[in-house]
């Protein structure tokens, strides 16, 4: 059985790209939800405290993280190598956002640490690695 699609790209490239795009679009939706006061009211108190007291630089970093991640995924699926650099910018945004989140002094539970802090970092780092792999294999050029 042949593992490559008609475009000469392994089938997993499309699956990983699509799943990563969905993940990052969820981040974009979350960003817009946090900008809406009515939606923000539905968040838990600990989450609202982080969002409401967030400085402009952290909000900007969050925007770079989520919009960069979504744009990078679109570029990856379009097989453009610039996706790698967009993912690097996105990871930088994630790290700055996490710097603020960890600095607010809220005691996070294990689930919150995994969902709010570790998963975005892991996903952003993975996408950098994966886009570099895709370049090496000639899937994006």
Language-model-detected regions and their locations in the chain:
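Topology signature of small-to-medium multi-pass alpha-helical membrane proteins
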Residues: 1-141
């Amino acid at each position: 059985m042949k593992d490559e699609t008609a475009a000469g790209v392994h089938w997993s490239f499309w699956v990983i790209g699509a799943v990563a795009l969905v993940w990052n679009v969820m981040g974009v939706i979350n960003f817009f939800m946090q900008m809406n006061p009515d939606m923000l009211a539905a968040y838990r108190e600990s989450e609202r405290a982080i969002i409401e007291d967030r400085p402009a630089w952290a909000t900007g970093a969050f925007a770079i993280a989520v919009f960069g991640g979504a744009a990078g995924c679109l570029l990856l699926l379009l097989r453009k190598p610039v996706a790698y650099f967009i993912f690097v910018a996105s990871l930088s945004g994630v790290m700055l956002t996490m710097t603020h989140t960890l600095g607010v002094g809220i005691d996070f539970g294990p689930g919150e640490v995994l969902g709010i802090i570790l998963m975005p970092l892991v996903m952003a780092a993975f996408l950098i690695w994966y886009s570099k792999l895709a370049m090496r294999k000639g899937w994006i050029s």
